[in-house]
Curated annotation (Swiss-Prot):
Signal peptide: none annotated. CDD domains: PT-DMATS_CymD. It comes from Epichloe coenophiala (Tall fescue endophyte fungus). One of its GO terms (biological process) is ergot alkaloid biosynthetic process. Keywords: Alkaloid metabolism, Transferase. Catalyzes the first step of ergot alkaloid biosynthesis. Ergot alkaloids, which are produced by endophyte fungi, can enhance plant host fitness, but also cause livestock toxicosis to host plants. The gene is dmaW1. This is Tryptophan dimethylallyltransferase 1. Substrate binds at residues 100, 186, 188, 264, 266, 268, 350, 352, 416, 420. Belongs to the tryptophan dimethylallyltransferase family. It catalyses: L-tryptophan + dimethylallyl diphosphate = 4-(3-methylbut-2-enyl)-L-tryptophan + diphosphate. InterPro entries: Aro_prenylTrfase, Aro_prenylTrfase_DMATS, DMATS-type_fun, Trp_dimethylallylTrfase. Pathway: Alkaloid biosynthesis; ergot alkaloid biosynthesis.
């Protein structure tokens, strides 16, 4: 046991001593994020070989696409991925012990006149992943990319006419689900800028693109039509008061980068009303889902709501991004996504508890209680330690920005719960005497 623990501890340090970095930005990204990445892989019981492979892929294929290392004063591309505009986020499926990460690929042209809205860097990043693992299929990615992101002419026009103000500039992200020593690649696409270019709403673009796809792939059509009917009925009777019948708006879309016969489409909806009745409505599609599995999942949602002590209210996304190091004083809207499975007439919901801005120790304790109640004993015993060791120099009792979202779904009589986590300046940061500090609970270096 002692030898195994020692071997685990050596992965990040061994790779750090072995790796050469193309520049200081990449070196800083590695030492800022890899300690937490390693700790999560250990918590989820990945083998030593898998840890080396995933951290190696991260260093060689992902870090070169994270752009300049963020500081308070330096110019950088701001990503919608986090409230601080950082382009990388780790997440953990606690029920299946699967580590994931999401990033927005950035390259030297991003934000310049060559690619003012970061439309094209993702293609370069994809080439790296295709080289490292077989089975990646770009058919649906290419389709949605064409339908929902800017082409070169649209990008040039919006930039030259200065038409982009406070809109979400992120157009696409990549995510890797780490299964054993392999990964499953998926994409997330935001059509906000396409909406500006075409004059169509995000809702029209998202649902229109999936509707057209469903005409060709009829196996997802019944689920799509049920979801569309739900959204239309909700929005027909939406209000702006404190009822749960607020307007549902499309935010983004995702799909797996595998064969279209196996790929899933997910449509994400923003729910401004944070309340248990609103979440129940999202979960049941306004009463359209009423089978036993739905009811069992609903009971767990109610349990989580109570454990987390969620504060209800009407929310909106604040603007602009939070400065690095800022302590949040905000709570965000809720969200849900709906998976369109082949040959399943009912969309599968996944709801999100927006816990960003809530006390992280209280969230951790609530999750640990949930894990114990549902006999996820291994995760219950490790979760708190994983986060403490990821941020060892922080006053964990006072933090309120480590947890961003908690997602929940329930299928085949089994719950699935994931946490989405702040993944910046982790481990014994700063590693170097000249290291930059943005998040430091003990002192705040205002010069960085």
């Amino acid at each position: 046991m002692v030898m195994a623990k020692t071997l685990h501890q050596e992965v990040y340090h061994t790779l750090s001593e072995t790796f050469d970095f193309a520049n200081n930005d990449q070196r800083l990204w590695w030492h800022s994020t890899a300690p937490m990445f390693e700790k999560m892989l250990q918590t989820a019981n990945y083998s030593i070989d898998a840890q080396y492979r995933h951290l190696g892929i991260y260093k060689s294929h992902v870090i070169p696409f994270l752009g300049v290392y963020p500081t308070r004063s330096g110019e950088r591309w701001l990503s919608i991925l986090t409230r601080y505009g950082t382009p990388f986020e780790l997440s953990l499926n606690c029920s299946d012990s699967v580590v994931r990460y999401t990033y927005e690929p950035i390259n030297a042209a991003t934000g310049s006149h060559l690619d003012p809205f970061n439309t094209f860097a993702i293609w370069e990043a994809l080439k790296k992943h295709i080289e490292s693992q077989p089975g990646i299929d770009l058919e649906w990615f290419s389709y949605f990319k064409q339908e929902l992101t800017l082409d070169a002419n649209e990008s040039t026009y919006l930039h030259s006419q200065n038409l982009v103000k406070e809109q979400i500039k992120t157009q696409n992200k990549l995510a890797l689900d780490l299964k054993g020593d392999k990964f499953v690649l998926k994409t997330y696409i935001y059509p906000e800028l396409k909406s500006v270019a075409t004059g169509k709403s995000v809702q029209e673009l998202v649902f229109g693109s999936v509707r057209k796809l469903a005409q060709k792939h009829k196996s997802i059509r019944p689920a799509f039509e049920m979801l569309e009917d739900y959204v239309q009925s909700r929005n027909k009777f939406s209000t702006t008061d404190d009822s749960h019948n607020t307007l549902l708006s499309s935010r983004l879309l995702s799909c797996d980068l595998i064969s279209p016969t196996k790929s899933r489409v997910k449509i994400y909806l923003l729910e401004r009303m944070v309340s248990l009745p609103a979440m129940e409505d999202l979960w049941t599609l306004g009463g359209r889902r009423e089978d036993q599995s739905t009811i069992e999942g609903l009971e767990m949602i109610r349990e989580l709501w109570g454990l987390l002590n969620m504060s209800p209210g009407l929310r909106a996304y604040p603007e602009p991004y939070l400065p690095l190091g800022a302590i949040p004083n905000e709570q965000l809207p809720s969200m849900a996504n709906y998976t369109l499975h082949h040959n399943d007439p009912i969309p599968e919901p996944q709801v999100y508890f927006t816990v960003f801005g809530m006390n992280d120790m209280e969230v951790t304790n609530a999750l640990t209680t949930f894990f114990m109640r549902h006999e996820w004993s291994d995760m219950a015993s490790k979760y708190k330690a994983c986060l403490r060791e990821s941020f060892p120099h922080h006053d964990y009792e006072a933090l309120n920005y480590i947890h961003s979202y908690i997602s929940f779904s329930y299928r085949k009589n089994k719950p699935y719960l994931s946490v989405y986590l702040h993944s910046f300046e982790t481990g014994k940061w700063p590693v170097f005497p000249e290291g930059l500090i943005a998040f430091d609970a003990c002192r705040r270096d205002l010069t960085c």
